[in-house]
Amino acid sequence: MGKKITDTSFAYAGTSTGAIIAAGLAEGYSAHDLFDLYKNNLKKIFTTYSWYKRLQPKCPTYDNTNLTKILKDKFKGKCGDWKKPVYIPTTCTNIQNVEKVWDLGDKDIDKWFAILSSTAAPTYFDCVYDKNNNCYIDGGMWKNCPIDVLNAGLMKSGWSNYKILNLDTGMTTPNNESGNKTLLGWAEYLFSHWIARTSYSGVYECKSILGDDSVFHASPYHQKKIKMDKTDNDTINQIVDIWTNYYYANRSKILEFMKL
């Protein structure tokens, strides 16, 4: 676009993988930096637990050790140290109010921990515990698309006259499920098609509050869902191509929206 996205934005929100993107932009990393971070570390992030550990019924598929090391290396300091507002949803399973959003007010929370807690997707990665033994899992359990969390945080802080660019990392895919299912089938459906998808309710809400012209929902269409743990080169290149084609097809609209 000719300018760094961090030069044209003042606040960020992201859940799960989006938490890394949002935190990275707030940290001052460029979009290219974050692309390289993902591309160079995807296979390390999705390191499968040994087969004998996975014999345990509650063992997730992937060991989060490498992800933790990467986050500790790239994100130093506390959440309160960020210079721009950041909102990172997570889910705390053993407190009364399970919906938690890390932000600048969490001055005693390490940045890396806030991000890791938002990425702890059930069945994929381990739960994450803080020093008080509070248990955290993926923020996508309740807010996979935190556009309304961002808007609420900004309004609460007194911001006005802003626009929101919403990047749908899950993309738009066909909804073709029908019929009754077994208990296990419904569980898989709810997890894959609801928890892991981008809910558009927040987009509708923000458009009704800010106006249609103040919200741009960027979401490429793809014929089928792509599992988040597919890290082969063909899949990575396919995703890059999908987003590249989407950008060039909508470039004029995006630049006009951002006034670049």
Region annotations inferred by a language model:
Residues 1-260:
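Patatin-like phospholipase
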